Swiss-Prot record:
Binds 2 Zn(2+) or Co(2+) ions per subunit. It comes from the Bacteria. Homodimer. Zn(2+) 2 binds at residues 112, 145, 355. One of its GO terms (molecular function) is acetylornithine deacetylase activity. HAMAP family: ArgE. This is Acetylornithine deacetylase. One of its GO terms (cellular component) is cytoplasm.
Amino acid sequence: MKNKLPPFIEIYRALIATPSISATEEALDQSNADLITLLADWFKDLGFNVEVQPVPGTRNKFNMLASTGQGAGGLLLAGHTDTVPFDDGRWTRDPFTLTEHDGKLYGLGTADMKGFFAFILDALRDVDVTKLAKPLYILATADEETSMAGARYFAETTALRPDCAIIGEPTSLQPVRAHKGHISNAIRIQGQSGHSSDPARGVNAIELMHDAIGHILQLRDNLKERYHYEAFTVPYPTLNLGHIHGGDASNRICACCELHMDIRPLPGMTLNELNGLLNDALAPVSERWPGRLTVDELHPPIPGYECPPNHQLVEVVEKLLGAKTEVVNYCTEAPFIQTLCPTLVLGPGSINQAHQPDEYLETRFIKPTRELITQVIHHFCWH
């Protein structure tokens, strides 16, 4: 029953108080099961059907899909349940205690992005879900901050095809219709060690990597010349060399060298296309030194994303907000949800607060966010 639902600020407080950290380091990684249980119970109280989906390949993590209404199409509101780890030495407040001060709600996940579910639940108090003409879906995903495994798995397995979706990442209520992707790779070169006094008796992996880097930088220039998307502040795919390590002593021929790099592809560029370009760039080194160069993913790749600018979702949201859609350089789960239906990224709070100590959401977002959620539900599910 709706009268069982706690007040907005108590929902928010309970979400923040329930840890759900995602981390590649196992010691820091946490299950989101308790948070999913909280959300599932609240949506059941509102009359939703709730499905909890274990996410394979994770450490006891789950997605939740709450649904109400009949028929095809409808609206999907989505967000992730996990947060990044916190640096205890840099926080001046308890990350798991919601505190309000000077027009700001502080806590880990207030902006990125547990708070979005509090806004959805609060808005639904005034919605009679039995009268919806089209279905309404609420998706809560796992592991966005690391592998995006939850959104990937949901998109791969669901039969849902809503009319449109909104992901409530912190965009300061500015609608986002496109962003770049992210690919991170490790280039490893295996040489042959030996004493530095006789270089011919070894294969210096650093020297081979020097050759490989030259070809990678040429690829970087080619990407900048061949691909362009004017709406982005950096209107071409970027390629960054972020980390390199090789060798263990000045008098030893380096036996192994490893380079970590990332590429930020534009929307429309496929992951297969980029992998092919990288392999082509490194082919001269591989052909000269067979079996010594390998390329491995550091993290699962994320494609670029774009919602068609003329889609009804864009037109409706721009009209409701009085603001044009934007494009951004950071990544979200949108590429995976976009495979199901046209998707916008739109939510309260600033992206500048994401992953920061003393994370907060300004209280000025409370009223307009609640109104926006109510309006999009009425537009896409009542008509």
